Amino acid sequence: MDFWELYDDYYARVKKFIFALVKDEWVADDLIQETFIKVQKNVHQLRDESKLSSWIFRIAYHLCQDHFRKTSQIRKREQVVSEKKELLSGPLFQMEFEQHQMSACVQDKIRLLPESYQTVLVLFDLMEFSHQEIAEILDISIENVKVRLHRARRKLKTILEEECRFEVDERSVFICQPVLKKLRDCE
């Protein structure tokens, strides 16, 4: 197997996958580089070339997991700051910006899911991997993939129902408004 062919064939998909998980271009670039360094060093150990795709994505997935372990506290702090900024931002009137905000709102809610649910949603819905491919990447059964996907969607629906109010404005733009939770009196 020629490394540069592998690189050309998989770079765009690996980049899309990693970026969907880490949501940071600089971090994604580092993880992509690490992924292909590991691929280059270990491709000779791959016994079954039919599993090449899942092997490459498993490497990328594990590197993302390592990154999340290292930065979990930082991510939690950044998420709180981001949510506070959104609540204080005021009304938005441009259609494109509202659509972007809707997407960002849903993505922020996806980040509230457990990591295993986030990963399955990204692999299936964004990356369009099959249940079989996801099972190979995550090293779990196909049935477990289906269960996680079902639970992830159900939990995301619950989060969206609890934390968002969806409306269609006068221009037929679907918008999401965060639900402001009332503060209880401390007694």
Residue ranges and their predicted role:
Residues 1-16, 32:
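A short, charge-rich alpha-helical start-of-domain segment used by transcription regulators
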Residues 36-51, 71:
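Sigma70-family region 2
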Residues 67-89, 165-169:
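Short, basic/polar amphipathic helix motif occurring as a linker/hinge flanking DNA-binding modules
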Residues 47, 58-79, 99:
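Arg/Lys-rich amphipathic alpha helix in sigma70-family domain 2
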Residues 138-162:
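DNA-recognition helix of helix-turn-helix
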Residues 30-37, 50-62:
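Structural recognition of an alpha-helix C-terminal capping motif at a helix-to-coil junction
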Residues 111, 115, 119, 127-144:
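Helix-turn-helix DNA-binding module
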Residues 2, 154-187:
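C-terminal edge and immediately downstream basic/flexible tail or linker adjoining helix-turn-helix-like DNA-binding
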